[in-house]
C-alpha cells in the first residue's frame, strides 16, 4: 500500500519533502504492534521538536525508513518530526492491545505503518515503548495508552491532540513546581537542584506570563486561577500578549488579572500597577515572549521595586521561529544575566507521577483538561481540519506555514491521516 512520509532536512529545517513509499512489512516482532497515524495536532511546538531533535533525541523517535527512496533514507540528513495524537492498530501480538484499537501517544507525521515494541505500564491500559533507539527520549514520549472511543468524540480527540500536550506544561507547573499540596519540584525535575517551599510560594508574588495567549500560557493562567487553593496566591497575574482581545474572557480567579499588549509591558501604568500591590516577589514565566519588550520590562520592574524584592525567571519556551546564530548567543547572555531557570515538562511529569501515583496523576490531568475546555478557555480558537500528508491541505503545508511564521496561533490545526 502506498503511503506518504513528510521528511525534513536536519541541517536546514526549511527544506522538506513529502515522499511516496510502498514499504515492505516485516514479520511483527515479539510484544509488538503495527499502527498507522490516525489523527494528530500540529502546532509551533513541532518546530521545537525539530530544532532540538538532536539534543533531546526527538529525531530518534521515528527514524526515516532505510528502504525509503534515496536520498531520503539517509538518517544523518533527513528526519521525521513527531506529533501528538492518535493511531490505529493494524496488527498486534499483544493480547491487551487488539487490532483496530486506538492508541494515544507520539506519532510520525506520515501515513506509513510503523512498529512499536511495548511493555505494560501503570495505570492499566498504558504501555511503555522499549525499542533501543528510543531509550534516550524523555519518559513521556515513550508512553502510549489505549483510548475508549465510546467515551470521546472525534472533536474532543482533536482538541486533546492539539492543545493537551502543551497545556500539560501549565498544569504541572501549577500543581508541582508552584505546589500548594505536594513537596515542590524543581522546574527541570527531580535532581536538578534545590527548589524549596519558599521557591514554590506565590502568596506574596505577582506572576507575569509572557506569551500569555499561547496554549501553555493559557494553561498556566487557568490552572493558577481554577485549580489552586485560594490562599496559595498569587497576589495578581499580569498577562502580556500580542493578541489581548483573545484573553478578554479571563478565568474566574481569587486575584486580579491584567492583560497588556507587549507595547504596554514596560509602560509606567503597568509597572505602577505591580508596584501598588507591594509584592515581595515577582515570578516571570516566559512562554515565548518578545525578547526586546521582555528585557525592557525586566529592567523597568527591577529598578522600580525595592531591592529586597525577589525575582524568579522561568524560561518555558521561545519565539516560534528559526533562530540565527547571533540570536542564539544573545539568548544565552540573557539567561546568564537574569539567572533564568529552564523548565522541562517531562521532568515535572515524572515527579508528579511518582508523587501521586500514575493512575491518580493521569485521571487528574485529563479531568482538569476537560474542565479547561468546558469553561471555554480556548473558545476563541478555531478548530481547523486538514487531511493527509502532502498537498495544500496536508501536513506538508502546515510545516511550510511554521517555517514561514504564518501558522495562525488562533487556529487549532488537526490532520486526519487514516
Where do the protein language model's features map onto the residues?
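Adenosine-nucleotide cofactor-binding segment
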Residues: 226-297
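C-terminal hydrophobic helical "lid"/dimerization subdomain
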Residues: 347-418
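Glycine-rich beta-strand-centered segment in the early N-terminal region that forms part
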Residues: 24-41, 54-112
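Eukaryotic N-terminal targeting leaders
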Residues: 1-27, 416-418
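ADP-ribose/adenylate-binding Rossmann-like module
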Residues: 284-287, 306-325
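Rossmann-fold NAD(P)-binding glycine/threonine-rich loop
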Residues: 301, 317-338
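N-terminal Rossmann-fold NAD(P) dinucleotide-binding loop
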Residues: 217-218
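NAD(P)H dinucleotide-binding glycine-rich loop of Rossmann-like/cofactor-binding domains
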Residues: 102-205
Amino acid at each position: 500500500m502506498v503511503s506518504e512520509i513528510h521528511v525534513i532536512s536536519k541541517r536546514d529545517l526549511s527544506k522538506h519533502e513529502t515522499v511516496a513509499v510502498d514499504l515492505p512489512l516485516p514479520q511483527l516482532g515479539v510484544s509488538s504492534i503495527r499502527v498507522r497515524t490516525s489523527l494528530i495536532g500540529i502546532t509551533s511546538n513541532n518546530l521545537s521538536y525539530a530544532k532540538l531533535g538532536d539534543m533531546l533525541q526527538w529525531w530518534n523517535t521515528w527514524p526515516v525508513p532505510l528502504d525509503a527512496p534515496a536520498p531520503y533514507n539517509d538518517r544523518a540528513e533527513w528526519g521525521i518530526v513527531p506529533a501528538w495524537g492518535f493511531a490505529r492498530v493494524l496488527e498486534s501480538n499483544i493480547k491487551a492491545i487488539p487490532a483496530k484499537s486506538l492508541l494515544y501517544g507520539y506519532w510520525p507525521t506520515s501515513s506509513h505503518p510503523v512498529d512499536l515494541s511495548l511493555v505494560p505500564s501503570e495505570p492499566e491500559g498504558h504501555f511503555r515503548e522499549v525499542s533501543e533507539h528510543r531509550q534516550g527520549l524523555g519518559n513521556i514520549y515513550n508512553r502510549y495508552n489505549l483510548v475508549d472511543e465510546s467515551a470521546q468524540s472525534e472533536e474532543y480527540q482533536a482538541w486533546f491532540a492539539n492543545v493537551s500536550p502543551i497545556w500539560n506544561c501549565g498544569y504541572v507547573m501549577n500543581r508541582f513546581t508552584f505546589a500548594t499540596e505536594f513537596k515542590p519540584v524543581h522546574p527541570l525535575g527531580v535532581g536538578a537542584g534545590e527548589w524549596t517551599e519558599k521557591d514554590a510560594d506565590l502568596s506574596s508574588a505577582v506572576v507575569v506570563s509572557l506569551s500569555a495567549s499561547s496554549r501553555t500560557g493559557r494553561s498556566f493562567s487557568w490552572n493558577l486561577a481554577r485549580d489552586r487553593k485560594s490562599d496559595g496566591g498569587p497576589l495578581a497575574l499580569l498577562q502580556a500578549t500580542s493578541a489581548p482581545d483573545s484573553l478578554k474572557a479571563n478565568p474566574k480567579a481569587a486575584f486580579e488579572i491584567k492583560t497588556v499588549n507587549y507595547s504596554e509591558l514596560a509602560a509606567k501604568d503597568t509597572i505602577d500597577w505591580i508596584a501598588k500591590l507591594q509584592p515581595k516577589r515577582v515570578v516571570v514565566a516566559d512562554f515565548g515572549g518578545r525578547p526586546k519588550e521582555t528585557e525592557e520590562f525586566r529592567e523597568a520592574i527591577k529598578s522600580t521595586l525595592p531591592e529586597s524584592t525577589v525575582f524568579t525567571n522561568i524560561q518555558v519556551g521561545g519565539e516560534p521561529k528559526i533562530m540565527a546564530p547571533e540570536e542564539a548567543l544573545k539568548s544565552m547572555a540573557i539567561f546568564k544575566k537574569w539567572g533564568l531557570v529552564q523548565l522541562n515538562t517531562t521532568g515535572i511529569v515524572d515527579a508528579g507521577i511518582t508523587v501521586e501515583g500514575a493512575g491518580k496523576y493521569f485521571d487528574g490531568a485529563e479531568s482538569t483538561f476537560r474542565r479547561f475546555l468546558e469553561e471555554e478557555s480556548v473558545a476563541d480558537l478555531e478548530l481547523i481540519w486538514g487531511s493527509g500528508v502532502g498537498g495544500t491541505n496536508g501536513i506538508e503545508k502546515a510545516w511550510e506555514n511554521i517555517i514561514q511564521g504564518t501558522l495562525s496561533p488562533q487556529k487549532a490545526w488537526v490532520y486526519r491521516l487514516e
